[in-house]
Every structure is written in structure tokens, then in C-alpha cells.
């Protein structure tokens, strides 16, 4: 019976914990489970068993997003709702093919593209959305950081920066500004394989939009430049004031349907529910 099965599981866990310690046990939860199930799983492992050995694909597949956004914004969660697409004047899609991987969100993005919203796609592959995009930056694989540095360069040198937002809400901007100002666009053009004039147009479109909304996927995060790319995407949003409002922000497209929820609920060894740092007693 189920009652007998639960008794066996409980007895075995207690026996292992008593013999080898709580850290000899680990739990793996699922990003296809509900928020409630994920919360209970991490709570059981942390409270009943007494260890932080709880994990899932939320940390593995989108660790660069979580870490990069944590460094930039203090949280690794998406900043906006998919419904905010209705308010966006520009959409920036980087390293993702949501028509295939996230069909509901992909359909909403496609509808926005077809309605004429200014659209920028960065992808080595010519996807259906890339065909529809206003600007397709078809980079060489491995040049994610380079293409974003080019965009940042043009936003800075062409005076498209949101000075009020930077002065009010950011730190160390001048260091970043000095770095991107000194970049050689001819060299980066050769590296990325994308015309610097096309990059300049895309940068202007993103920076001058009233509300520009960014989405990125596993083409960014499952990559050796993942965290740096996410931090540069964050920098672009901050330097143009495209954060903290409806219709803007950074919005990772995760690998499974509830990766965001699993992370929110604390299914990761280094953070509890609500992204609480386990190393901080408060």
C-alpha cells in the first residue's frame, strides 16, 4: 500500500541520515512540477532531512542567467510578464527560437513582429522569427559578447544613453563607458561577421524605443560566455532605461515549463525560496 511505501521511504532516509549524516542525502526536483510541489520538496530536504542538497535543472540550464542577473539586478528572475509584449515598442530576441521551444510565448512574439513592432534578432541561424525581424544580426557562433559590445559602443558614442536612469539607479557606469568607447568596430565587425552599420541601426532601434523588451534563451546560457552575455544584456537595458517598467526588461526563456517557478521556490543548493542566500543567517 501507499502507507507502507511511505513508511519504507521514511525509515530508509532516517537510517541513512543517522549512519552517514544529513549531507549524504540529496534531492532532485523537477522544473515540470508545480510551484507547490517544488516548494514542498526543497522544504522536506532542508527541514526534515537537514541538508541544502536540493537541486534541479533550474540551476543547471540557466545558471548563467541567474548569476548574471543577480549581479546586475539583485535577482535572477525574469523582470516582466509575457503579457507586457502588448506594451513593447521594440523586441530584442537573443539566442532563442521560441516558436519551436516556447510556442505560446513564441506565438505572441510572432504576432508582435507581424504587427510591425521594431524587432531585433541575434542568432547564427535564420529562424522564422529572424526572417520576420526588422534587423537580423546573424553572428558567427561564439561572438555573443562581441556583438553586444558593438551595440553598447554605438549607444554610448551616439549619445543614446538614458542619463537620468544611470545617475539614479546604477553604479560604475563610467568604467563600462570607457571600455566600450575604446573598442575597434572594424575588428569586431570581422569577428562577428555582421556589418557594423547594421549593428548600429539595431542599437539605435533598441535605445530609442519608448519600451524595448528583451528575451534570451539557451543560445545564450548554455555557452561558455553565458554569464558575461547576460550581464551585457543587463547593461544595455540599464543604460537605455529599459528596466523597471511595463513592456521592457530582461526575460529569459527557460528550458522547461516551470524553471522559473522551481528557482523561485528554492530548488537550488545555494538559495532558498525567494532567492534567500543560505549563507546569510537573516
Predicted regions and their residues:
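Catalytic alpha/large subunits of respiratory electron-transfer oxidoreductases
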Residues: 1-282
Amino acid at each position: 500500500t501507499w502507507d507502507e511505501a511511505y513508511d519504507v521511504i521514511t525509515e530508509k532516509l532516517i537510517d541513512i541520515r543517522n549512519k552517514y549524516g544529513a549531507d549524504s542525502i540529496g534531492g532532485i526536483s523537477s522544473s515540470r512540477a508545480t510551484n507547490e510541489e517544488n516548494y514542498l520538496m526543497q522544504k522536506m530536504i532542508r527541514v526534515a532531512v537537514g541538508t541544502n542538497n536540493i537541486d534541479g535543472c533550474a540551476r543547471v540550464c540557466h545558471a548563467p542567467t541567474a548569476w548574471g542577473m543577480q549581479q546586475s539586478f539583485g535577482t535572477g528572475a525574469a523582470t516582466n510578464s509575457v503579457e507586457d509584449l502588448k506594451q513593447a515598442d521594440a523586441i530584442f530576441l537573443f539566442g532563442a527560437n521560441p516558436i519551436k521551444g516556447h510556442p505560446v510565448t513564441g506565438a505572441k512574439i510572432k504576432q508582435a513582429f507581424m504587427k510591425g513592432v521594431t524587432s531585433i534578432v541575434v542568432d547564427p541561424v535564420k529562424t522564422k522569427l529572424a526572417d520576420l525581424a526588422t534587423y537580423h544580426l546573424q553572428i558567427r557562433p561564439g561572438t555573443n559578447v562581441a556583438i553586444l559590445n558593438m551595440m553598447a559602443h554605438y549607444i554610448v558614442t551616439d549619445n543614446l544613453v538614458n542619463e537620468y536612469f544611470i545617475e539614479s539607479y546604477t553604479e560604475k557606469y563610467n568604467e563600462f563607458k570607457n571600455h566600450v568607447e575604446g573598442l575597434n568596430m572594424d575588428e569586431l565587425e570581422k569577428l562577428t561577421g555582421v556589418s557594423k552599420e547594421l549593428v548600429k541601426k539595431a542599437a539605435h532601434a533598441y535605445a530609442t524605443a519608448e519600451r524595448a523588451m528583451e528575451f534570451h534563451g539557451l543560445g545564450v546560457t548554455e555557452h561558455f560566455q553565458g554569464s558575461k552575455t547576460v550581464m551585457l544584456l543587463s547593461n544595455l537595458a540599464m543604460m537605455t532605461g529599459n528596466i523597471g517598467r511595463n513592456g521592457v526588461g530582461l526575460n529569459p526563456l527557460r528550458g522547461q515549463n516551470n524553471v522559473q517557478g522551481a528557482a523561485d521556490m528554492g530548488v537550488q543548493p545555494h538559495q532558498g525560496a525567494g532567492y534567500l542566500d543560505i549563507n546569510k543567517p537573516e
